[in-house]
Amino acid sequence: MLHLVDFALLKPYLTVEEIVEGARKAERLGVAAYCVNPVYAAVVRPLLSRVKLCVVVDFPFGALPTAARASLASKLAEIAEELDVVAPIGLVKSRRWADVRRDLISVVGASGGRVVKVIVEEPYLTDEERYRLYDIVAESGAHFIKSSTGFAEEAYASRLGNPVHSTPERAAAIAKYIRERGYKLGVKMAGGIRTKEQARAIIEAIGFGEDPTRVRLGTSTPEALA
């Protein structure tokens, strides 16, 4: 199962030493990718050989202007194999779909062919918003729909009737939409995945097998899934 895991250390208070130790753990466990904030990309790069480097873009709010997001993605693509890009959540909630489309096409296009996972922040979305956003993610050329930053505000999510953590039901719904639309997208679930039982249930709910090009699980505690 670890070959499907993106080990993420993204808390703002983590030290350089903790990020370096995380890289060593990632290599030791043999996860799919080690995901860090942009400031640590150059530090982590030489520490990884069998594990891919993943860097987040405009995390966790998706609130930078498109030009800044695209420029950052372009620079990070010189270092990292994978980019986890937060969708422009405010534009999504404003239902400014043309702006969302322009943004994601620009950012993915600037990513130099690297694997791009677009974080749609499921806890904040209505069904209408999420399905429109999935369509735009597919159109942008991204490779994965990623469910959440793991930083979503529970009070707002609960107003919409959404959980803040990953669930098999949400994973199944994303995968079902991808299948029905014929999209070649993977599914990455993140947020609250802390046991092997949870992870297994989510993998089975997605139904894409155990192919790391189609399925990923984001967690800050990968040893719990070993």
Swiss-Prot record:
Family statement: Belongs to the DeoC/FbaB aldolase family. DeoC type 1 subfamily.
Phylogenetic lineage: Archaea, Thermoproteota, Thermoprotei, Thermoproteales, Thermoproteaceae
Domain of life: Archaea
Active site residues according to the UniProt entry: D84 (proton donor/acceptor), K146 (schiff-base intermediate with acetaldehyde), K188 (proton donor/acceptor)
Pathway assigned in UniProt: Carbohydrate degradation; 2-deoxy-D-ribose 1-phosphate degradation; D-glyceraldehyde 3-phosphate and acetaldehyde from 2-deoxy-alpha-D-ribose 1-phosphate: step 2/2
Reaction it catalyzes: 2-deoxy-D-ribose 5-phosphate = D-glyceraldehyde 3-phosphate + acetaldehyde
Alphabetized UniProt keyword annotations: Cytoplasm, Lyase, Schiff base
Protein name: Deoxyribose-phosphate aldolase
Species name: Pyrobaculum arsenaticum (strain DSM 13514 / JCM 11321 / PZ6)
Gene: deoC
